[in-house]
Amino acid sequence: MTKKIGIILGSTRQGRISPAIAEWVTAGVAKHPELSAEMLDLGAINLPLFNEPTIPSVAPGVSEAAIAWREKVTSLDAFIILTAEYNAGYPAPLKNALDYLKTEWANRPIFTISYGFSGGASAAHQLSEVLIRIGTVQIEPNIAILIGDKLNANGGIDDPHASLAIHDEELDIALNAIEAWAPTEEPTDV
């Protein structure tokens, strides 16, 4: 049975490089016949700031946005989160997307790819704390992409496959772990 991976683009700003990184990730997933990928671009999904009447650990969100996001997340088996690092943290839209749900994240494998001038280390660390709290299964090793030497004059990545090839083995290890992962009977709330 094919496992469906949601690739979450955590940055929504114009000029972001996550679409180029997602292109490289999608090509890596395509090399694994037991996996398929679906892009979850938070910029396109455009979740409003979390403002549900209750918190997700008490009751599911009731807004159209919350229901659609919950249905999308629960339709997938695993996730790869692409996170930029802004001011030593991960982007607010990513935190917002995580906060909309609680038990839906539990026991789901999540692999993080961070990027920034320091590889996104601070963002990855902060994100890891949240992922632990919501009960995900974190797939290691995370990938930290140093972007300084990969950016063109416009701040983009011209050829993500060539620029990110140094991380191909790490991506393959993570994808193998997702392939091998077996879910528990029922998600647990943490």
Predicted regions and their residues:
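N-terminal beta1-alpha1 ligand-phosphate binding loop
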Residues: 2-33
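Feature detects long, helix-prone N-terminal segments enriched in hydrophobes
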Residues: 6, 38-39, 72-76
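A short beta-strand-loop structural module common to alpha/beta enzyme folds
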Residues: 35-45
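N-terminal beta-loop-helix "entrance" segment that forms/cooperates
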Residues: 43-60, 151-156
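Helix-loop-strand module that forms the ligand-binding subsite of alpha/beta enzymes
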Residues: 59-135
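Glycine-rich phosphate/pyrophosphate-binding loop and the adjoining helix
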Residues: 137-190
